[in-house]
């Protein structure tokens, strides 16, 4: 239902909603916006968004100058706000600086709840290394470009996963993101793969819980979803290939399911001309 009205916002909070004009006498620094011919609606919340990866191509992620990709992320943040999204939960990527710039009023954008670097196993959905890169601990050359910029981090074993989770929390993550299943945009895994041992996932869960927060996981298939739930994960991302028993488990354990449904016509990876 729509109607004509007036809204008073004080310090980013809605104070008054009225069908009649709202007196502003005595309120300093009032800005009046004429909404004639327009609609005012509550701000939308996107529970799964990538400020950085939604606007940068895979080639950008692997090769582009970091400053260039961050400028694109800032532009996308403003566009997201203008689409009506005032709060987003960022599901992975280097957005700590972007969040700070928005919070300090340097850039326009939604409130961001950041996850930080995607945490992936070797050969997992967040492993963007070239085929000639040796796996750790045999790699002689340190972090890859995507790891240095904070897009993803490779962690194998309980200790490495714990460090990766704690480091994201140190940088300001409001939740931790693990890649516990395969995907369609990664180089070395299949969609149906199960990733990370239960003990590794639980290590991230413990680190998150000690910081008063939780773990969200990228995952599609029942086996991988069930493993994540048994490890203590609170939020399942995607889960498109879920079955009935796994859905019942989600309900019993009161797990959040954030599905991001899409169709073949959504064109998730448009060409430059299409963009």
Map each language-model feature to its residues.
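Histidine-rich, glycine-flanked metal-binding segment
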Residues: 2-41
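Divalent metal-coordination and catalytic microenvironments
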Residues: 7, 12, 37, 45-48, ...
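Short amphipathic alpha-helices and their capping/turn segments at secondary-structure boundaries
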Residues: 26-39, 98-106, 160-174, 242-255
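Metal-associated gating/positioning segment near the N- to mid-region
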Residues: 38-104, 122-131, 199, 231
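Active-site mouth loops of central-metabolism enzymes
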Residues: 58-71, 129, 139-163, 214-216
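Active-site core of metal-dependent hydrolases
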Residues: 65-66, 115, 122, 178-275
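Short, acidic/polar
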Residues: 69-79, 156-169, 220-224
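Active-site glycine- and acidic-residue-rich loops that bind
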Residues: 92-94, 150-166, 229, 234-244
């Amino acid at each position: 239902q729509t109607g004509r009205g007036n809204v008073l916002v004080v310090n980013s909070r809605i104070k008054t909603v009225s069908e009649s004009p709202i007196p502003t006498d005595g309120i300093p620094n009032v800005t009046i916006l004429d909404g004639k011919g327009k609609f005012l609606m509550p701000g939308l919340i996107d529970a799964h968004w990538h400020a950085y990866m939604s606007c940068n191509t895979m080639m950008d992620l692997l090769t582009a100058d970091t400053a260039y990709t961050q400028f694109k992320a800032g532009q996308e943040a403003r566009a997201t706000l203008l689409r009506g999204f005032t709060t987003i939960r960022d599901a992975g990527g280097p957005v700590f600086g972007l969040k700070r710039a928005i919070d300090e009023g340097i850039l326009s954008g939604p409130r961001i709840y950041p996850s930080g670097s995607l945490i992936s196993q070797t050969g997992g959905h967040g492993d963007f290394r070239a085929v000639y890169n040796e796996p750790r601990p045999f790699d002689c050359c340190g972090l890859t470009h995507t790891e240095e910029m904070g897009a993803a981090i490779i962690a194998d074993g309980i200790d490495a996963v714990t460090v990766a989770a704690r480091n994201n929390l140190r940088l300001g993550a409001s939740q931790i993101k693990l890649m516990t299943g395969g995907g369609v945009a990664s180089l070395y895994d299949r969609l149906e793969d199960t990733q990370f041992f239960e003990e590794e996932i639980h290590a991230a869960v413990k680190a998150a819980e000690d910081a008063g927060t939780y773990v969200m996981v990228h995952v599609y298939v029942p086996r991988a979803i069930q493993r994540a739930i048994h490890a203590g994960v609170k939020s399942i991302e995607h889960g498109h290939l879920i079955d009935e028993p796994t859905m019942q488990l989600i309900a019993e354990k009161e797990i959040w399911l954030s599905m991001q449904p899409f169709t073949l016509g959504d064109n998730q990876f448009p060409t430059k001309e299409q963009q």
